[in-house]
Amino acid sequence: MVLTENLKENDINEALSMTGVIHLKDKNLGDLSGGEFQRVLLARAISKKPDLLVLDEPVQGVDFTGEIALYELIKKISDELNCGILLISHDLHTVMSATDHVVCLNGHVCCSGSPIEGAKNNEYKVLFGEQASQILTRYKHSHDHIHTSEGEIKKN
């Protein structure tokens, strides 16, 4: 894939810095680890400050700790650049717990909507089982507080 226009050095450095790989700027891609490679690809994708970032299996070839860091980075980039994320993934845990809208494909669109709506869909239940729809779906809170990922409770 070739970028269609030249980028300014400043834009390249900013994207590499944002993804934490500015120190790898002059390295050969073949010398990078899986996580480094994915971060460089992510830097390339954000270098033009897109409105929509399309990511196909963005944590492929990355260890578990690196996966967490990459997903946190993707969220940070989405927030800072104010861009939407279209995430293609087979990682059902991430898809169902960290997304706003899900489209489940199995040769056709089985279901779409919020993760909670998707998990209630009969085709979803047939594909992944009743247990998956209960375990993998984010619990929707209707109280005056939220639970943070650090386990803290914060008032709304």
Predicted regions and their residues:
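Conserved switch/coupling elements of ABC/ABC-like ATPase nucleotide-binding domains
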Residues: 107-117
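Catalytic Walker B motif of ABC-type/P-loop ATPase nucleotide-binding domains
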Residues: 53-57
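ABC ATPase nucleotide-binding domains
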Residues: 128-156
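Conserved ABC ATPase signature
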Residues: 28-32, 36
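H-loop/switch region of ABC-family ATPase nucleotide-binding domains
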Residues: 89-90
